[in-house]
């Protein structure tokens, strides 16, 4: 049981007249409904990290000497210390010498946490499992109490094996991301120690001072977004070319690709032009392009210029100056770096060096104009931002069409008058550490006679006998293929990507050779980047708001097979909340949660168990004695809030809150042997409906979103749980007796080989069925969709619709509702019905 004075030890150790730490006397009001989490980097007698989880009105706290680690193989000692007040999660400052914990403190990470089991029980038993949703740490974690001796309880902090885990030798989050998430501070080193370079805010009005010449500066990369963000931004045209960094030392010029390959010898005219700037120690950043007759960048022409030795046609459009004449400008504001660069290039209109001008138009108008002109899109850069050698939310790109690089995995032979190749087979690597190569479709248009010949010549030496793909697509999709080693990239535009990750209406634009094939994992538009200074309003980076709920990590993939993000899932639930709430609003709700997406661990949750979701209702504990409260979802806010906390599926009881002891429906879940053809499922559904017709009961149909069909039979609230379940079981057994070759009334895979199990078990008290219009946690994110009985013969599968194709389904219905008569259906179980089933 929580202490009546949980902060007594905290207060005893501190003199709040001297220390800036919060006293905790005024409890922090919780407006989000989320449980807070934070990690503070504390430079006390020894540098360590304080790990804190909100519970029962305080922050449970552990000192982690070596800090958190994303590697599940690494256990980090965590010494439990006194509880801290909730306000401490925002504390940054310097604790004076001579006081407890003297030294500097920054907020290294913060966000929300979700217990995966009862957290009080976990703390008592010594094993707390939870999910983090922070700016740096996320996914599932464990705190495990040890038997190590010490003055204080000693635990291990361990990362679980999930999609957020990373091996320590590949990524050390403490070294890679050392700074504050609250203020962009870094801890200063003690005397005689070296500090990790900090990601400081950009400076205005002064340079970085004379510093050693960097051997290499990796370029800053832009993040793909769907719409222009708010805030102060400068926009330029997006150039369809090759990224190039220029290093000038003692007047000697080197031209380097984004991966550090030296292209100086390939571009002597640019080497000469850059030398003509008279620079001695500088780095410049820009893009190689070739312009067509109308002055537009032409990627195919750029390739041809390299292939045909006509490099003099290549222009170098410069847009940044990260290092200038011995001064490191990476921490200087964007507009000041660009002003210096523009001055360098002034008056060189006939030169192959050009300046990428800032365009003053509204970004939406600018993008529309760029698209009309056939350009690739626009680039936005946040005013005041520093130059960072990584993909950044300070640089964004808005594209006119879906266009990206793909790995060529094979080609088909030409037909008819076409020569050299028919089509290219394309692949993309998975973004995880396993880097699996998956099939992404074909491209057969956009080629010229010359490019067909060139592509064939490039691919023939790469020919191999077997497919390089992790999963070979069916021959009907690919035809006869010559597979190749996955080394060559091409750039392709396309109209859409299907839920299976296959591109449609693809157009070839050229081969690429400026990056390794294994880097090509595909792009997915992100939400607008956060405003500078907006961190205090948000518990995590890269957030978006949907139905009034802030979505953390909006671009986290819920289903990599269709590149479906957490934000897309949240937006689906906001858009179709009215449909979902018809089933959810008046019933206890259970959740299927997958914080790491469908590929991670999934768990079923029917009780609150300290889970806080904005807008969700915790029901009277007396409804389910001996357990935490049941859950109820009444609003779009609660629905989207559940998605924010990792929920994917929503299940409901067969009784409403009007009378939880009297079910108002029963469900027959037709669950097939996976090997059965779909036709057998349709026949089984019709046979089950026929039996219900004979009994005088009307059923309403929906696809399960999985493999089977659900038949929902409304009832007047006259029967108890046992009576309803017994009746549903009688139907199941009756079908199995009549047609034992088709139906089974016994659960378990062994009992439904070649058959369909008529699952009646969902009719027990506390059992539940996936709600109508709920997404399923399966590949493709299918949806459980109501259908008319007359549509049965035309159904193609139980997973026919998913979160992206449901809008088309609803448009086709044009307002017709397959369940329009559901609420008005009045029927009950009679003695005559029982006798028909042999239960008289």
Swiss-Prot record:
Enzyme class: ligase
Residues annotated to bind Mn(2+) 4: 669, 759
Residues annotated to bind Mn(2+) 2: 240, 376
Binding locations of Mn(2+) 3: 669, 671
Gene3D superfamilies in the cross-refs: 3.30.1490.70, DNA ligase/mRNA capping enzyme, DNA primase, PRIM domain, Nucleic acid-binding proteins
Entry EC number(s): 6.5.1.1
GO biological process, one term: DNA biosynthetic process
The keyword Mitochondrion is assigned to this record: no
Catalytically driven reaction(s): ATP + (deoxyribonucleotide)n-3'-hydroxyl + 5'-phospho-(deoxyribonucleotide)m = (deoxyribonucleotide)n+m + AMP + diphosphate
Modes of activity regulation: rNTP addition and end joining activities are stimulated by Ku homodimer.
Result of altering residue 40 to A: 41% ribonuclease activity, 7% 3'-phosphatase activity (in PE domain)
Cofactor section: Mn(2+)
Cofactor binding annotation: Binds 4 Mn(2+); 2 Mn(2+) for polymerase/primase activity, 1 each for 3-phosphoesterase and ligase.
Result after altering residue 54 to A: Nearly wild-type nuclease and 3'-phosphatase activity (in PE domain)
Feature: compositional bias, Low complexity: 536-546
Region entry 3'-phosphoesterase domain (PE), spans: 7-162
SUPFAM superfamilies: DNA ligase/mRNA capping enzyme, catalytic domain (SSF56091), Nucleic acid-binding proteins (SSF50249)
Site entry: Transition state stabilizer: 84
Miscellaneous field: LigD has variable architecture; domain order can be permutated, domains can be independently encoded, while some bacteria lack the 3'-phosphoesterase domain entirely.
Domain notes: The N-terminal 3'-phosphoesterase domain (PE) has 3'-ribonuclease and 3'-phosphatase activities.
Similarity comment text for this entry: In the N-terminal section; belongs to the LigD 3'-phosphoesterase family. In the central section; belongs to the ATP-dependent DNA ligase family.
NCBIfam families (UniProt xref): LigD_PE_dom, ligD_pol, NHEJ_ligase_lig, NHEJ_ligase_prk, PRK05972.1
Subunit composition and interactions: Monomer. Interacts with Ku.
Protein name per UniProt: Multifunctional non-homologous end joining protein LigD
Name of encoding gene: ligD
């Amino acid at each position: 049981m929580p202490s009546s004075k949980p902060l007594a030890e905290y207060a005893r150790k501190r003199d709040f007249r001297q220390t800036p730490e919060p006293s905790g006397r005024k409890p922090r009001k919780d407006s989000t409904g989320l449980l807070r989490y934070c990690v503070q980097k504390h430079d006390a007698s020894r540098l360590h990290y304080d790990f804190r989880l909100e519970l029962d009105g305080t922050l449970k706290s552990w000192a982690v000497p070596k800090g958190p680690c994303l590697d599940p193989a690494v256990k980090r000692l965590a010494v439990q210390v006194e509880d801290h007040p909730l306000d401490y999660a925002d504390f940054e400052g310097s604790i004076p010498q001579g006081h407890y914990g003297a030294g500097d403190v920054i907020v290294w990470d913060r966000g929300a946490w979700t217990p995966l089991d009862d957290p009080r029980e976990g703390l008592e038993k010594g094993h707390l499992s939870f999910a983090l949703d922070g700016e740096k740490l996320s996914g599932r974690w464990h705190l495990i109490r040890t038997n190590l001796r010490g003055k204080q309880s000693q635990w291990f902090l361990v990362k679980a094996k999930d999609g957020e885990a990373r091996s320590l030798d590949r990524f050390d989050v403490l070294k890679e991301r050392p700074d504050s998430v609250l203020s962009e501070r870094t801890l200063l080193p003690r005397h005689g120690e070296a500090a990790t370079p900090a990601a400081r805010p950009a400076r205005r009005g002064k340079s970085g001072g004379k510093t050693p010449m960097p051997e290499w500066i990796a370029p800053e990369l832009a993040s793909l977004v769907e719409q222009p963000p708010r805030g102060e931004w400068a926009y330029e045209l997006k150039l369809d070319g090759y990224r190039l960094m220029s290093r000038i030392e003692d007047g000697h010029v080197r031209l380097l690709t984004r991966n550090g390959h030296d292209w100086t010898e390939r571009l002597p005219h640019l080497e000469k032009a850059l030398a003509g700037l008279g620079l001695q120690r500088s780095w410049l950043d820009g893009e190689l392009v070739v312009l067509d007759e109308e002055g537009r960048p032409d990627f195919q022409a750029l390739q041809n210029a390299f292939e045909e030795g006509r490099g003099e046609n290549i222009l170098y459009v410069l847009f940044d100056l990260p290092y200038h004449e011995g001064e490191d400008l990476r921490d200087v504001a964007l507009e000041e770096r660009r002003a210096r660069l523009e001055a360098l290039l002034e008056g060189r209109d006939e030169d192959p060096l050009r300046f990428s001008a800032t365009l003053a138009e509204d970004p939406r108008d600018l993008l529309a104009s760029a698209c009309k002109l056939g350009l690739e899109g626009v680039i936005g850069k946040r005013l005041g931002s520093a130059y960072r050698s990584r993909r950044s939310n300070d640089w964004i790109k808005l594209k006119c069409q879906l266009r990206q690089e793909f790995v060529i995995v094979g080609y088909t032979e030409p037909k008819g008058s076409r020569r050299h190749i028919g089509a290219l087979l394309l692949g993309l690597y998975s973004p995880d550490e396993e880097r699996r190569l998956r099939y992404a479709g074909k491209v057969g248009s956009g080629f010229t006679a010359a490019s067909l010949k060139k592509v064939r010549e490039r691919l023939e030496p790469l020919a191999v006998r077997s497919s390089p793909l992790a999963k070979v697509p069916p021959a009907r999709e690919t035809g006869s293929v010559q597979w190749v080693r996955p080394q060559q990239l091409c750039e392709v535009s396309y109209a859409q990507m299907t839920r299976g990750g296959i591109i449609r209406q693809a157009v070839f634009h050229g081969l690429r050779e400026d990056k390794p094939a294994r880097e090509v994992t595909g792009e997915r538009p992100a939400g607008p980047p956060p405003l500078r200074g907006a961190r205090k309003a948000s518990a995590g980076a890269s957030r978006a708001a949907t139905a009034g709920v802030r979505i953390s990590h909006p671009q986290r993939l819920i289903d990599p097979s269709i590149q479906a993000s957490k934000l897309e899932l949240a937006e689906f639930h906001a858009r179709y909340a009215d449909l979902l709430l018809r089933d959810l609003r008046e019933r206890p709700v259970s959740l299927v949660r997958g914080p790491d997406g469908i590929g991670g661990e999934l768990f079923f949750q029917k009780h609150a168990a300290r889970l806080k979701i904005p807008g969700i209702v915790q029901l009277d504990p007396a409804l389910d004695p001996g357990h935490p409260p049941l859950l109820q979802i009444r609003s779009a806010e609660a629905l989207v809030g559940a998605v924010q906390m990792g929920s994917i599926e929503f299940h409901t009881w067969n009784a409403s809150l009007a009378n939880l002891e009297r079910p108002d429906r029963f469900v027959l879940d037709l669950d097939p042997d996976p090997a059965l053809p779909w036709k057998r499922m349709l026949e089984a559904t019709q046979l089950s409906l026929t039996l219900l017709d004979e009994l005088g009961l009307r059923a309403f149909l929906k696809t399960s979103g999985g493999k089977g069909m659900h038949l929902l039979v409304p009832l007047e609230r006259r029967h108890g749980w046992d009576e309803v379940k017994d009746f549903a079981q009688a139907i199941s057994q009756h079908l199995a007796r009549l047609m034992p070759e088709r139906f089974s009334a016994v659960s378990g895979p062994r009992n439904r080989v070649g058959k369909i199990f008529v699952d009646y078990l969902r009719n027990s008290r506390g059992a539940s069925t996936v709600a109508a219009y709920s997404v399923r946690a399966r590949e493709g994110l299918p949806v459980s969709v109501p259908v008319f009985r007359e549509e049965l013969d035309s159904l193609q599968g139980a997973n026919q619709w998913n979160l992206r194709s449901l809008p088309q389904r609803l448009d086709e219905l044009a307002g017709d509702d397959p369940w329009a008569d559901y609420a008005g259906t009045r029927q009950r179980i009679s003695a005559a019905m029982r006798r028909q089933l042999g239960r008289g």
